[in-house]
């Protein structure tokens, strides 16, 4: 299949798993968070420990969602719930946002220790689209989007960035809802 880029006015790309190979870092951070937390709960309640499943749980409950929504959805799958808390909750708080902060700490460590690279074919495509004059946006629920795009040297390619900070600020629904992509299209003045 060949794409005729001249037929498009813009390119909107997800970050994790499309531009950069960060999905594995996110998955590992989620696993560490939930395995640690579930072990704590199992010890406290004297119930069996069932680990977070990277294949099923990651894809179904947390992939691409804002952290607090991923925590909520995964815990609900285990018939558990926590108070939402607030975005300012620290990682020591047993709230949806607090557990989200723990996941963020695990992700930051993995990012520092292993780094991140961009997919070469995606980089070629992005440069081609930019050379053709297309407007460009990066869309991600990650709060580290700007840092990651800068690390891989691609920040100058994008006219617009809608990331986890903007999703929180604008109270947009996380994926699979299209809200963040629609916001990027609006900012680019492009009809989706």
Model-derived segments and their meaning:
Residues 2, 128, 152-153:
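A general structural signal for stabilizing positions within well-ordered secondary structure
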Residues 122, 142:
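Short, flexible active-site-adjacent loop segments at beta-strand->alpha-helix junctions, enriched
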Residues 4-120, 131:
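N-terminal helical cap/lid subdomain that shapes the substrate entry/recognition surface
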Residues 134-135, 143-192:
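Substrate-recognition "cap/lid" segment bordering the active-site pocket of phosphatases
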Residues 123-131, 185:
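Surface-exposed amphipathic alpha-helices with a cationic face
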Residues 12-15, 126, 154, 188:
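Generic leucine side-chain signal with a strong bias for well-ordered alpha-helical environments
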Residues 31, 127, 182:
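A cross-family signal for key residues in well-ordered alpha-helices
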């Amino acid at each position: 299949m060949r794409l005729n880029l001249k037929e498009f006015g813009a390119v909107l790309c997800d970050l994790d798993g499309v531009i950069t190979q960060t999905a594995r870092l996110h998955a590992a951070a989620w696993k560490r968070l939930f395995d640690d937390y579930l072990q704590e709960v199992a010890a406290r309640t004297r119930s069996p420990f069932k680990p977070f499943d990277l294949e099923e749980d990651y894809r179904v409950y947390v992939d691409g969602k804002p952290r607090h929504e991923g925590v909520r959805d995964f815990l609900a799958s285990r018939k558990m719930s926590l108070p939402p808390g607030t975005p300012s909750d620290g990682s020591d708080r047993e709230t949806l946002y607090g557990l989200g902060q723990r996941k963020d700490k695990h992700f930051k460590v993995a990012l520092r220790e292993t780094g991140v690279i961009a997919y070469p074919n995606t980089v070629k495509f992005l440069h081609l689209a930019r050379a053709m004059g297309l407007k460009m946006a990066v869309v991600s629920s990650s709060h580290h989007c700007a840092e990651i795009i800068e690390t891989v040297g691609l920040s100058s390619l994008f006219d617009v960035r809608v990331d986890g900070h903007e999703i929180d600020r604008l109270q947009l629904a996380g994926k699979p809802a299209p809200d963040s992509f629609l916001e990027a299209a609006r900012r680019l003045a492009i009809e989706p």
